[in-house]
Amino acid sequence: MKITRFGVSVPDELLEKFDRIIEEKGYVNRSEAIRDLMRDFIVRHEWEEGDREVAGTITIVYNHDEADVVKELLELQHDYVDEIVSSLHVHMDEHNCLEVVVVKGKAGRIKEIAERLISLKGVKHGKLVMTTTGRELV
């Protein structure tokens, strides 16, 4: 892989803050931190394009005592069998459950799945975490 060196002009205060953060996070140098930022920027762009193949997780916390929430959750997951790769179910306490759904597919479709899961009656909190399939990252 060919590496290109380039210069970036930034205010001193911004660079000082950046250097403190990359040291806290354990980066060995600025270049690796900047590469990670560039990769994250590319991944976010992939998600903006609804027809791109992406991956992610949808995490929800719900009250399993809520009428029909478990049934609706299972039905919804079966509606998207091509995009839902797997799921993990955790009993948080006697009433609350955490479900992590691993998804892969077109960005627009993944967002649709997340919106439907998160908006189910009985879901207390939900979050879509987006990432990449890794195919186009170096």
Swiss-Prot record:
A single GO BP: response to nickel cation
Entry-linked CDD domains: RHH_NikR_HicB-like (cd22231)
Domain of life the protein comes from: Archaea
Record InterPro entries: Acetolactate_synth/TF_NikR_C, ACT-like_dom_sf, Arc_rbn_hlx_hlx, CopG, CopG/NikR_regulator, Ni_resp_reg_NikR, Ribbon_hlx_hlx, TF_NikR_Ni-bd_C
Binding note for cofactor: Binds 1 nickel ion per subunit.
Pfam families registered for this protein in UniProt: NikR_C, RHH_1
Residues the record lists as binding Ni(2+): H78, H89, H91, C97
Cofactor(s) of this protein: Ni(2+)
One term of GO molecular function: nickel cation binding
Keywords: DNA-binding, Metal-binding, Nickel, Transcription, Transcription regulation
Assigned protein family: Belongs to the transcriptional regulatory CopG/NikR family.
Function: Transcriptional regulator.
PANTHER family for the chain: NICKEL-RESPONSIVE REGULATOR (PTHR34719:SF2)
HAMAP family (UniProt xref): NikR (MF_00476)
UniProt protein name: Putative nickel-responsive regulator
Annotated source species: Thermococcus onnurineus (strain NA1)
Phylogenetic lineage: Archaea, Methanobacteriati, Methanobacteriota, Thermococci, Thermococcales
